[in-house]
Swiss-Prot record:
Organism annotation: Oldenlandia affinis
One annotated GO biological process: defense response
InterPro entries in the record: Cyclotide, Cyclotide_moebius_CS, Cyclotide_sf
Protein name, per record: Kalata-B11
Coiled coil start-end: none
Keywords: Disulfide bond, Knottin, Plant defense
Domain remarks: The presence of a 'disulfide through disulfide knot' structurally defines this protein as a knottin.
UniProt family annotation: Belongs to the cyclotide family. Moebius subfamily.
Cysteines engaged in disulfide bonds, as pairs: C5-C19, C9-C21, C14-C26
Amino acid sequence: GLPVCGETCFGGTCNTPGCSCTDPICTRD
């Protein structure tokens, strides 16, 4: 299935593939 991009992040990168960091949470690219 599609990756779930729910981790928190602050100006960095996301551990989940296909996700980008939009402070303060990762969102799907």
